[in-house]
Amino acid sequence: MSHYTIGYHDQQRHHFEICEYADNTFDAIQHAKEDVPFLKDHPQYIDEVLLEKK
């Protein structure tokens, strides 16, 4: 598993980040959508997915 940081914004353009452990980028996004209900309905608000290097 790798460590990912998912950056997203809300409707007022406030920036947020959530960290997830996942096997790949797709899974990291899916975990973020489970943990942040807003993202489940608004996945287009995800701005970036960064793989953290060890």
Model-inferred region functions:
Residues M1-F16:
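Short aromatic-glycine-(Arg/Gly/Cys) micro-motifs in beta-strand/loop hairpins
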Residues H3, D27-A28:
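Generic alpha-helical structural signal
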Residues H9-Q11, D27, L39-D41:
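Intrinsic low-complexity/disordered segments
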Residues Q12-E17, Y45, V49:
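Generic detector of bulky aromatic hydrophobic side chains
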Residues R13-D27:
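A short, exposed loop/beta-hairpin motif centered on an aromatic-Gly-Thr core
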Residues Q30, E34-K54:
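Short, mixed-charge low-complexity intrinsically disordered segments
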